């Protein structure tokens, strides 16, 4: 190869290799000046990988998550605060890690899981679609590569059971992480006498555990339900569609989804 230096004269030199995690350049060598120029050119062209840690520090994202939680609490829904979004992110990461996915895919699942409910800051109805639009707008202002942004946006737009479904490993893990977050302390209403069916169903769950068995390719949600608070019929009236969605998501990961309630296999 021929490189032109600052004085515009060709420089011919020995073979050198400059290696980065994305590129390998073979040059018929050059002065330190030329090598330095090439190396910096490579670094400047590389797209920065946005991390989950950086996303969690983003003030705009945190503001939307906070508003989403406030909106749904005021409307009488269960907890959708940062506690929920963090749990979904952690659970999605654990699923993909157990199934052997690479760190980058896991990182995208954590980001999408953390951001998945921001659309509730606009409105509960169509919150997945609103969230996808918001996420795309916010992430455009970061250093996240386009392909990664599209993956996150698609996941958010497809996470709701009424309109979406798993389309790739990231969305599959986030869907399972989201739909299996069933716990008593998600109930924001403290007045038991005014519980609606959603409150009763969540409050009735005294114990919930998600188990991931990559060897057997099985993801299991095991629940203990206080039937004096909520009947099994009530539970499945509310959650059956979500559990079926989890089954489809597990299929995308090449696994099966199983549900047990009070020791009995249900799904």
Residues of each region from the PLM?
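Short, low-complexity intrinsically disordered segments enriched in A/P/G/S/L with frequent Arg
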Residues: 9-14, 19, 29-35
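Short alpha-helical hairpin
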Residues: 52-70
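Short, Lys/Arg-enriched N-terminal segments with co-localized hydrophobic residues
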Residues: 32-49
């Amino acid at each position: 190869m021929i490189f032109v230096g600052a004085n515009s004269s060709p420089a011919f030199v020995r073979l050198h290799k400059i290696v980065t995690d994305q590129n390998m350049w073979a040059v018929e060598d050059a002065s330190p000046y030329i090598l330095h120029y090439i190396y910096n050119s490579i670094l400047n062209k590389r797209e920065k990988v946005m991390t989950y840690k950086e996303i969690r520090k983003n003030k705009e994202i945190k503001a939307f998550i906070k508003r989403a939680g406030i909106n749904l609490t005021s409307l009488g829904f269960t907890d959708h605060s940062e506690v929920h979004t963090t749990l979904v992110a952690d659970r999605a990461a654990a699923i993909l890690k157990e199934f052997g996915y690479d760190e980058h895919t896991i990182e995208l699942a954590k980001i999408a899981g953390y951001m998945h409910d921001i659309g509730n800051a606009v409105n509960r109805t169509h919150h997945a679609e609103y969230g996808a639009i918001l996420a795309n707008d916010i992430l455009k202002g970061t250093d996240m590569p386009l392909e990664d942004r599209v993956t996150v946006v698609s996941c958010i737009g497809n996470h709701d059971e009424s309109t979406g479904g798993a389309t790739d490993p990231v969305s599959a893990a986030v869907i399972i992480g989201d739909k299996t977050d069933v716990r008593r302390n998600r109930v924001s209403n403290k007045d038991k006498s005014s519980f609606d069916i959603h409150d009763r169903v969540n409050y009735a769950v005294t114990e919930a555990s998600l188990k991931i068995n990559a060897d057997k390719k099985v993801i299991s949600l095991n629940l203990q339900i206080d039937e004096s608070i909520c009947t099994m019929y009530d539970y499945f009236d509310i959650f059956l569609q979500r559990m079926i969605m989890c089954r489809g998501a597990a299929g995308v990961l090449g696994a099966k989804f199983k549900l047990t309630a009070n020791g009995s296999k249900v799904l």
